[in-house]
Swiss-Prot record:
N-glycosylated, O-glycosylated, and sialylated. It is a single-pass type I membrane protein. It comes from Human cytomegalovirus (strain Towne) (HHV-5). Its main location: virion. Interacts with glycoprotein L (gL); this interaction is necessary for the correct processing and cell surface expression of gH. The heterodimer gH/gL seems to interact with gB trimers during fusion. Forms the envelope pentamer complex (PC) composed of gH, gL, UL128, UL130, and UL131A. The pentamer interacts with host NRP2. Forms the envelope trimer complex composed of gH, gL, and gO. The trimer interacts with host PDGFRA. The trimer also interacts with host EPHA2. Keywords: Fusion of virus membrane with host cell membrane, Fusion of virus membrane with host membrane, Glycoprotein, Host cell membrane, Host endosome, Host membrane, Host-virus interaction, Membrane, Sialic acid, Signal, Transmembrane, Transmembrane helix, Viral attachment to host cell, Viral attachment to host entry receptor, Viral envelope protein, Viral penetration into host cytoplasm, Virion, Virus entry into host cell. The heterodimer glycoprotein H-glycoprotein L is required for the fusion of viral and plasma membranes leading to virus entry into the host cell. Following initial binding to host receptor, membrane fusion is mediated by the fusion machinery composed of gB and the heterodimer gH/gL. May also be involved in the fusion between the virion envelope and the outer nuclear membrane during virion morphogenesis. In human cytomegalovirus, forms two distincts complexes to mediate viral entry, a trimer and a pentamer at the surface of the virion envelope. Residues 741-742 are intravirion. Belongs to the herpesviridae glycoprotein H family. The gene is gH. This is Envelope glycoprotein H.
Amino acid sequence: MRPGLPSYLIVLAVCLLSHLLSSRYGAEAISEPLDKAFHLLLNTYGRPIRFLRENTTQCTYNSSLRNSTVVRENAISFNFFQSYNQYYVFHMPRCLFAGPLAEQFLNQVDLTETLERYQQRLNTYALVSKDLASYRSFSQQLKAQDSLGEQPTTVPPPIDLSIPHVWMPPQTTPHGWTESHTTSGLHRPHFNQTCILFDGHDLLFSTVTPCLHQGFYLIDELRYVKITLTEDFFVVTVSIDDDTPMLLIFGHLPRVLFKAPYQRDNFILRQTEKHELLVLVKKDQLNRHSYLKDPDFLDAALDFNYLDLSALLRNSFHRYAVDVLKSGRCQMLDRRTVEMAFAYALALFAAARQEEAGAQVSVPRALDRQAALLQIQEFMITCLSQTPPRTTLLLYPTAVDLAKRALWTPNQITDITSLVRLVYILSKQNQQHLIPQWALRQIADFALKLHKTHLASFLSAFARQELYLMGSLVHSMLVHTTERREIFIVETGLCSLAELSHFTQLLAHPHHEYLSDLYTPCSSSGRRDHSLERLTRLFPDATVPTTVPAALSILSTMQPSTLETFPDLFCLPLGESFSALTVSEHVSYVVTNQYLIKGISYPVSTTVVGQSLIITQTDSQTKCELTRNMHTTHSITAALNISLENCAFCQSALLEYDDTQGVINIMYMHDSDDVLFALDPYNEVVVSSPRTHYLMLLKNGTVLEVTDVVVDATDSRLLMMSVYALSAIIGIYLLYRMLKTC
């Protein structure tokens, strides 16, 4: 018997005893023998170990031979050969080896392993002190808290922007409702599985615990990142091929038990006041995970109070995610994506720890935190998962219950920003049927307010944050199509060349606090015609900055993989160049350079030879049908003047195109004020040029040429205003005469 095994069995027995006393199994003995000869039979790696009911052996004692009982009724003796006629004898309670937990442990230990194989196993896995040499400890104080306090939104609105208040229909307040709630269980996902963790692992004993799994499969079954979350710790599994994956285990780890000869200290890479990080990776895999040797690996996740959820999201996850997105590393497994996955798992872990604080939290703050958790989950799926994704969505029943109650209780959500987050939570938790039409109507009105605010200015960080959430709503719901179509056209109209140019300039800045800073409406809009080739054609004399490819890469990553939530657009091939415009409740337009979709088409004739532009009008109630053939066509009428009476030109799109380059800009005009703004020569939206033309795509399905249009602003509305003003003047004059007479 090789040296060290007796000590190992003693340690094993102590572990078994402690687990038996603390587990739900308890200590128990088998009441009946397995057969007539043996008391216990264990299968260890397919080789049975039999414990005899009765057996004797001879040993030398004071120069005399005597028999010694090896197996007794209440104990099992282990005799280990030391030298000729010398044994180490250990007596252990039989009940330690007779219960289900004992079988679970012993079946994971190969007691028949040869010395050569044992020595090979010693050199298989990397040890931190020997192979990584990058151990670090952090001494910061850890406390569950929220550094944003009661701030209702992560990014606050500009001081000069008035946030609309929410109007709610009269409802009955549920009994027992209070304005503030404890954080207990609020951000804790539902642990819907009982997992056998580390089953069959070379180094670890398996453990049974409530948990949840979330996998992100990049290309195939061999390349993935998997998150396993338990009550006390989480595991990040990184697989690059079919070999043993790397494990990052973080948290409170007394239940993570190592097999001999390894000990926990051999694998501790990072250590904080309350938690440890273990890394288990084979030596021959270190070349693929060389970042484990970097002394600053995971510093941005662990060198502050990471139990502060808001600080964790800002300082850690968003920092890593921004780096991944800007560098185009989505769908790759390297240091950046591994750190991002770890920060995501740490956010889930910290969110579940919020209940430890036992503090009260307002409804708007709770909604913002929960929406932030769901938003980073959505980004993880977008960035890492293949298409279509196979990732299991996490469920938050307590947060959903809070959202439902707040939705039907007056005065609980007063600002539109809180309503946006509430609806976002319900939509991402498969609760679309609970979202009322009045809620989405107000969100669409908020989108229109942002549209008007930024007609002549670049988007603020706050606007990008809100449009990010609303853009996701558009593509994740099937209900309330009218309101979703309105939000969709707002995002499409905001995706201009000016916005794309400004967005590329933003990417040149080295620091971005949140992912929403890198959001552009182009990501959620109907514009699918931006490409590096097209931008190069539009600006042939300009040097394309390095941030332009990064911007287009971000668009490619963040854009939805389908338009299936819109029945009249779902069949559009997203790999082709087009613009989809949902200008009104019933009418959509698709702008392409070839016939692509069935409908009423308006071919544009004022383009050079070799260039084509086709505008196809579809009905929102008609199922999308792909076609490459010419179909029903109408001619485009030139309009010489526009009247604003009856708002006939409201809910339309102004399309700017070039004879040689095709579509340049698209602007959404919701009401008469937008039309006046667009056609006012002082705003330089419509600029006279021999090669540039302007079309207006109307809500009634008509397309007009408006390059030389004149706006008739003397409509009945302005006339009535003049009449009212004149009447007021006359009234004041008559009142003056009466007072003077008196």
